[in-house]
């Protein structure tokens, strides 16, 4: 196959991808929502094989390093309480962009943490940001689909959510020996950038007239 043929094929695929992104096609939404669903488990679990190496790096006990897992899971739970009402009030796109930016910044801070205490604190923020993807993915599915289509989309999201916690440590284990724990967080950073780009391409799915006007106090009282 000639270079010209390769070039034409690549150009055709790029045009196809651009059309899917521009129109927010079903395939684009499936990929985006699937990645957002897997985002939280990857944030919490992908670095697990790196725990011993991180203990040596920060010169601390393994129990202290494991606090990073605990705080990220706390953040994952707290973030759902935060991003759920935000996405109902301000739409899906703005909170999603905020979550992605928050994740990117917190991941960079994790990479440059000077001690284990800073790292644990930044992991909490990472978990909060990761929760945004899980909550908003389900909300977008409910906005865009109904009936059997919604059931199929939620089934796919549920399957991904079940598989991701198993796959994430395996992927982390494969890469840990080659690139170290910083490399694992570099992969997470790259994933965050990809999702940020996808979030900018995403069109708002919740019209203003359907948004909630309730106050934060009402949310917690309910």
Tell me what each language-model feature is.
Residues 21, 207-222:
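Juxtamembrane intracellular "pre-TM" segments in multi-pass secondary transporters
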Residues 28-62:
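Extracytoplasmic
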Residues 45, 73-81, 165-166:
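Residue-level signature of mid-helix packing/kink "hotspots" within the transmembrane helices
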Residues 118, 155-200:
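Helix-loop-helix hairpin linking two adjacent transmembrane segments in secondary transporters
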């Amino acid at each position: 196959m000639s270079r010209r043929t390769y070039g034409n094929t690549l150009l055709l695929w790029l045009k196809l991808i651009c059309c899917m992104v521009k129109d927010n096609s079903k395939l684009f939404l499936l990929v985006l929502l699937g990645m957002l669903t897997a985002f939280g488990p990857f944030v919490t679990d992908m670095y697990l094989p790196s725990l011993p190496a991180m203990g040596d790096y920060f010169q601390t006990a393994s129990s202290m390093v494991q606090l990073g897992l605990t705080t990220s899971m706390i953040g994952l739970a707290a973030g759902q309480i935060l991003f759920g009402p935000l996405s109902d009030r301000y739409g899906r796109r703005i909170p999603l962009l905020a979550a992605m930016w928050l994740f990117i910044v917190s991941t960079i801070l994790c990479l440059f943490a000077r001690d284990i205490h800073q790292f644990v604190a930044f992991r909490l923020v990472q978990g909060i940001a990761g929760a945004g993807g899980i909550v908003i993915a389900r909300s977008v599915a409910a906005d865009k689909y109904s009936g059997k289509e919604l059931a199929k989309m939620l089934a796919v999201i549920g399957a991904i959510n079940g598989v991701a916690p198993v796959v994430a440590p395996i992927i982390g284990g494969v890469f840990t020996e080659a690139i170290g724990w910083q490399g694992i967080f570099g992969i997470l950073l790259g994933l965050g950038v990809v999702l940020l780009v996808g979030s900018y391409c995403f069109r708002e799915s919740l019209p203003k007239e359907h948004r909630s006007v309730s106050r934060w106090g009402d949310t917690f009282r309910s």
